[in-house]
Regions:
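A short, exposed loop/beta-hairpin motif centered on an aromatic-Gly-Thr core
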Residues: 24-35
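Short, charged, surface-exposed hinge/linker loops at domain edges
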Residues: 1-6, 34-72
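Flexible, active-site-adjacent loop/turn segments at secondary-structure boundaries
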Residues: 21-26, 46
């Protein structure tokens, strides 16, 4: 099974927020997308083990979303 992680930019807090429907309990934030991905890489295996699922290695699929307004 591939575990999907969604990273969304929170413009109000100026952080990236990661959540996953596939990994119960996963909610992390960081100021950079790279740092957030690293945090997810560290937390996901532990959360999956605590929830009684997962295997080693754990396949993760990241999607990111950021909306911005630009002047014309």
């Amino acid at each position: 099974m591939e575990y999907r992680v969604k990273a969304i930019w929170d413009d109000d807090a100026h952080v990236w927020v990661a959540t996953s429907e596939d990994i119960p309990g996963l909610t992390l934030e960081s100021g950079s997308l790279d740092a957030l991905i690293e945090r997810v890489r560290m937390a996901a295996p532990e959360l999956l083990q605590l929830n009684g699922s997962g295997s080693d290695p754990v396949p993760l699929c990241f999607t990111s979303e950021r909306h911005e307004w630009v002047a014309i």
